[in-house]
């Protein structure tokens, strides 16, 4: 009799489980059927494509889309990422810079305008047609803020044409602006109770008057009454990749900038430029170093890991102490890049970055010693 009841319970359990699995497959099938044909084909070819659980707000974050100087074409990874947006159904798309392939004095006005036209074809126009807001920061290949010996901008024409493109009413990125007086270089906007600030991190230097504007914006009631604050910039605070581990490739006075951002409770700084995805933190500031979709992914410093092109689905849960979760995909394979696959810390020339799931106190003595021997204690603290 006991054996009969055991078999009966097992049969009932299997029936319920089978129904649940079938329902899950049906839901997936229903979602697949609603997707555009191009999206559905990519999802089917990927096999078990991870669909992260939704929370309050979802961003898809991309970066560094460009290829060679003057190019008006984009790598397949860019088009693939754009095609997958209907699968992830973000509330907004965010880009941490380098949307076009400028920063060359040899480029003519017509060539620069052609690059922005190509960007519009591949990225901006599809987003507008999908009614997806697009928050972004200017990169060095978009409109570098590097200056000459007289203090003028080396790439003045590129800056003028970038501003011209973005300020055309037909190119409205669909943002709820708060301050757009110096858009697209320095501006603020809000989205679903999140305050966003974009600064011009297209070079390592931010002038004092612009830093004053940044601080004033972060101190404003709009910023402080928001549930969360996010900063967008191109150059990161600290170096993480080979070929970028030197002054000029990160923001000057990184620790001072971080202290200011922490003072106003900025949660996350989203950056690009180093062409490597690394989910890090330093102190109380989350540092999302974005992978690229364009040309030239870079390896991490002190690592043998192969470089990967990647994009990140960032979900925000206002009830969670962590606020954010990342689902980052190798855009070639569409496999998730897990935290455990990445270095536990990176010790670039101007300071340590720790992987976001690890605290300073959890680092091994050998890891702390490695950093301190290279950089000294001041640059290796929590």
Give a label for each model feature.
Residues 26-49, 105, 109-224, 256-262, ...:
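Extended active-site neighborhood of metal-dependent phosphoesterases/phosphodiesterases
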């Amino acid at each position: 009799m006991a054996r009969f009841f055991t078999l009966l319970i097992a049969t009932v359990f299997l029936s319920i489980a089978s129904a649940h699995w079938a329902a899950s497959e049906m839901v997936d099938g229903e979602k697949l059927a609603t997707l555009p044909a191009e999206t559905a084909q990519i999802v089917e070819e990927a096999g078990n494509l991870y669909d992260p659980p939704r929370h309050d707000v979802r961003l898809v974050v991309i970066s560094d889309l460009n290829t060679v100087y003057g190019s008006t074409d984009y790598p397949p990874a860019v088009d693939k990422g754009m095609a997958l947006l209907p699968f992830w159904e973000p509330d907004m798309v965010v880009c941490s810079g380098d949307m076009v392939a400028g920063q060359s004095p040899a480029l003519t006005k017509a060539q620069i305008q052609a690059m922005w036209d190509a960007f519009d074809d591949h990225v901006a126009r599809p987003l507008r047609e999908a009614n997806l807001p697009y928050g972004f920061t200017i990169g060095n290949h978009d409109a570098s803020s590097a200056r000459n010996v007289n203090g003028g901008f080396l790439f003045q024409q590129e800056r003028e044409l970038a501003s011209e493109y973005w300020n055309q009413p037909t190119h409205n990125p669909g943002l709820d602006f708060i301050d757009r007086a110096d858009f697209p270089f320095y501006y603020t906007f809000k989205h679903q109770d999140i305050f966003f600030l974009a600064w011009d991190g297209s070079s390592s230097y931010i002038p004092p008057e612009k830093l004053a504007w940044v601080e004033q914006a972060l101190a404003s009631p709009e910023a402080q009454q928001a549930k969360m604050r996010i900063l967008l910039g191109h150059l990161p605070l600290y170096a993480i990749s080979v070929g970028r581990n030197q002054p000029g490739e990160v923001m000057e006075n990184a620790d001072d900038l971080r202290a200011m951002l922490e003072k106003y409770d900025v949660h996350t700084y989203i950056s690009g430029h180093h062409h490597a995805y690394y989910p890090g933190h330093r102190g109380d500031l989350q540092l999302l170093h974005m992978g690229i979709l364009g040309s030239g992914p870079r390896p991490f410093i002190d690592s043998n890991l192969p470089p990967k092109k990647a994009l990140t689905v960032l979900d925000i849960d206002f009830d969670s102490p962590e606020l954010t979760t990342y689902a980052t995909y190798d855009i070639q394979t569409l496999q998730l890049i897990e935290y455990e696959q990445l270095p536990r810390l990176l010790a670039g020339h101007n300071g340590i970055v720790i992987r976001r799931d690890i605290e300073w106190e959890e680092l091994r003595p050998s890891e702390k010693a490695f950093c301190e021997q290279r950089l000294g204690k001041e640059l290796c603290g929590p």
